[in-house]
């Protein structure tokens, strides 16, 4: 089975890595593909696509993952056609809860199943309407977001506890996110 982890990765953080690791441990995944959205249709990005690809390659270097740039604007377009074969699209509980608002969620599930990482002590997202096309697995993940990482960089604060060390080094080396403001990466309510 192929596991697919998609996102803007602006920047990738420890939560993304924990999600990938938990999926690899809990599910019969023999191939993990990390799709870095080049031009996502659901949100603005701060760093350019090639930079985010580099950051994701650094973040997932310790895992058996293939990190690639995805030119599709929406998840449905990336998975349509079934070219990933038997596949699950891996998301955390927050994205799982937002799944019904994604562009063509039923079409996404025609081609892949949704694998939702849920945290102990938190209610799982209500996705029962999708039946066996949605599976869940236990996730022990740090509470971190890309917004939090960018805000810390903007404030001149260290991010070594939020992102893998090579990502922190690349952010510093490239001078990323220093001019970040919340409005620079606002989310469109119609996502993925």
Question: Could you tell me what each predicted segment is?
Answer:
Residues 1-192:
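Nucleotidyltransferase catalytic core that binds NTPs
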């Amino acid at each position: 089975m192929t596991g697919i982890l998609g996102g803007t990765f602006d920047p990738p953080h420890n939560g993304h890595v924990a999600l990938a690791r938990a999926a690899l441990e809990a599910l019969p995944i023999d191939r993990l593909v990390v799709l870095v959205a080049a031009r996502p249709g659901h949100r603005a990005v701060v760093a350019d696509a090639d930079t985010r690809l580099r950051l994701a390659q650094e973040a997932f270097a310790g895992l058996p993952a293939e990190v690639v740039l995805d030119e599709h604007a929406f998840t449905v377009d990336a998975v349509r056609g079934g070219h990933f074969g038997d596949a699950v699209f891996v998301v955390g509980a927050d994205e799982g809860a937002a799944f019904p608002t994604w562009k063509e969620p039923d079409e996404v599930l025609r081609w892949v199943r949704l694998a939702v990482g849920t945290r102990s002590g938190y209610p799982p997202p209500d996705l029962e309407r999708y039946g066996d096309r949605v599976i869940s697995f236990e996730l022990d993940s740090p509470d971190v977001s890309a917004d939090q990482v960018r805000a810390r960089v903007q404030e001149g604060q260290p991010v070594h506890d939020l992102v893998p060390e090579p990502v922190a080094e690349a952010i510093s080396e490239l001078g990323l996110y220093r001019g970040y403001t919340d409005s620079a990466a606002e989310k469109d309510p119609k996502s993925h």
